């Protein structure tokens, strides 16, 4: 009976736990223009139902058409002159996000030592996000770790910026390599929250389930970028649990690989599949997706090996057959090109 590589399904995790913790931080982030969806990429539905937190993905640098004007006026607004738009960034006032997704230019330094954490309700003045981005404009309340605002194009970047700010801080957000600010934020106040390490294991798993559930909803709605963020946040929560960790990590890595393929990141997709296959060597969807990724990377031998493993277990699997056919054709084209090159060398 054919095992569908397309429709979400429940899975039993039978693999033995791995003793080493994998370093997947880089692999939890990816976002580029969305490509046409291919068969065999839909994520599995979680057996338990629901999942949440933080894959983000590193956002692609975009051209900002409408630069943000400086804030003026009373204490409820930014105190920035328009001349500041052209000033060179001073190294002493810069904060670089560790994942490289943005640079924060501090305009007014905040006070105190505390910063927003998971669950903190932040009173924020946000101005200048690109039109249609879905991000709030003006005074708003944003809760770290929850809310649909985090699923917007600039949501996760904004959340990471807020987590780096102190009360009263005003800052401009710059994308890497851009001197024009994407937006400006002022953190007026925030409530106490908790770091992820302060959460009990059951709390982390509950948050991860909600994030997973939301990620699958977004994927089915045609938003692999938003889905990847959700899956990445769920994985980051679960990776803080003692090894081997819950079996749901296998499904999350497989789902993340599906998103990464659609987003044009075959190298990251292959790495996500590796994490799955370390725990469950016979995971058909991971084998298929890694085969697709290897083909995209030009490693036709590895692609062929993975796809043949799928067909050995499920000979009627149409998606694997079609992909293997493409790989064979691609190999013949490469061989023909090599032969022409050799003839020219010895002619």
Curated annotation (Swiss-Prot):
Gene Ontology terms: cellular component: extracellular region
Superkingdom in the source lineage: Eukaryota
Short name of any one Pfam family annotated for the protein: TPR_1
Region (Disordered): 1-36
Key word Phosphoprotein present: yes
InterPro entries: FKBP4/5/8-like (IPR050754), TPR-like_helical_dom_sf (IPR011990), TPR_rpt (IPR019734)
UniProt-listed SUPFAM superfamilies: FKBP-like (SSF54534), TPR-like (SSF48452)
Sites of Phosphothreonine modification: 3
Gene3D superfamilies: Tetratricopeptide repeat domain
Keywords associated with the record: Phosphoprotein, Repeat, TPR repeat
Residue stretches of each TPR repeat: 208-241, 250-283, 284-317
Keyword Repeat recorded: yes
GO annotation terms (biological process): regulation of angiogenesis; regulation of blood vessel branching
Assembly mode: Forms a ternary complex with CDKN1A/p21 and HSP90AB1/Hsp90.
Function, in words: May be involved in response to X-ray. Regulates p21 protein stability by binding to Hsp90 and p21.
Protein name per UniProt: FK506-binding protein-like
Organism whose genome encodes this protein: Rattus norvegicus
